[in-house]
Amino acid sequence: MTKNVLSIQSHVVFGHAGNSAAVFPMRRLGVNVWPLNTVQFSNHTQYGHWTGGAIDATQMVELVDGIGAIGMLPRCDAVLSGYLGTPEQAQSVLEIVKAVKAANPRAWYFCDPVMGAVSGCKVEPGIQEFLVRTMPGVADAMAPNHTELQRLVGREIETLEEAVTACRELIARGPKLVLVKHLLDRNSPADRFNMLVVTEREAWMGQRPLYPFARQPVGVGDLTSAVFVARTLLGDSIRAAFEHTLAAVNAVVKATWQAGRYELELVAAQSEIAQPREWFDAWVGDTA
C-alpha cells in the first residue's frame, strides 16, 4: 500500500525550497505527499528580496482537522516538518502531530529543525528557542545541520566523535534517530560533504563530493530530509535509506553544478532521485 506523508514546510512560487524542494522527490520515489505550506513566498529568502507571508497558525490546524473530518487522517504514515514562519506555527505543529498519532498510532514525526544561520535563511525570533526546548521531546526523528545540532546541545562540535556524542545526547531527550544533514568534521578532506545518521546503537557516516558553487543552492537540506523520509517509509533499513539519500542528493547537486544553476535541478535529475547512478557506501561512525 502506498505510504502517505504530511509535509509541513515553506513554499516558494519560483525555485526549490521547503515543500517546493521536498514534494516532487518524495512523489518521484513513490510516496503520496500532503503538502501543508507554512509560508508562501515568491522565492526563497537568500535572494535578499521576496514577497508573500506566513499562513495563520490556526488555519494549519483547521486544514488537518478537515482531513480528519473526511476520515482520511488514519492514512497518514508520517509527519515531516521544516521551515516555520511564526512561533505560533510551531505550537500548531505539535497539535497536528498529536492529532495524526491519535488517528494512526503507528505514524511517526520527523522534525527538520530549520533555525536559520549564516547562510541567510530568515527565521522569526522565538522559533529557534521552541525547537531547542520542545521538539526533541516530541519528534521521533530529527534532522539538524551542523549549526542546528550545536544549538540543540548548546556547544560547539568539531569532530565526528563529538557529533556522535551530541546526537546521542539528543536521542536521550526523545528522538530515536538523528540525521545530521551536513557535518563539519575538521578531520575530513575539504572537498568532501559529510553526513551522519545516529541511533542509540548505530552510527553511519557518509561522504559525497563538495561542489565548488559560486553561490550554494538552497533547498539541499529540504531535499535530504524528504528523500530519507521517503526511503524509510518504503521500508529501507537506516543504512540503506541513508546511502540512497546521499546518492540521490549528490545527483541533484551535481546536475545543478554542471548546469551552472542556482536553483536545484530536480526535474533534470529526477531519474537519479529514484535510481542514482553513483553510490557512496556509508561506514560505521561509532558503536554504542
UniProtKB/Swiss-Prot annotation:
MF-aspect GO terms: ATP binding; magnesium ion binding; pyridoxal kinase activity
Cofactor: Mg(2+)
Keyword Methyltransferase: no
Metabolic or biological pathway: Cofactor metabolism; pyridoxal 5'-phosphate salvage; pyridoxal 5'-phosphate from pyridoxal: step 1/1
GO biological process: pyridoxal 5'-phosphate salvage
Enzyme Commission number(s) of this protein: 2.7.1.35
Residues annotated for ATP binding in this entry: 112, 143, 148, 181
Alphabetic keyword roster: ATP-binding, Kinase, Magnesium, Nucleotide-binding, Transferase
Positions annotated to bind substrate: 10, 45-46, 222
Top-level taxonomic group: Bacteria
GO cellular component: cytosol
Catalytic reactions of this protein: pyridoxal + ATP = pyridoxal 5'-phosphate + ADP + H(+)
Subunit structure: Homodimer.
Function: Pyridoxal kinase involved in the salvage pathway of pyridoxal 5'-phosphate (PLP). Catalyzes the phosphorylation of pyridoxal to PLP.
Assigned protein family: Belongs to the pyridoxine kinase family. PdxY subfamily.
Protein name: Pyridoxal kinase PdxY
Organism annotation: Paraburkholderia xenovorans (strain LB400)
Native organism taxonomy: Bacteria, Pseudomonadati, Pseudomonadota, Betaproteobacteria, Burkholderiales
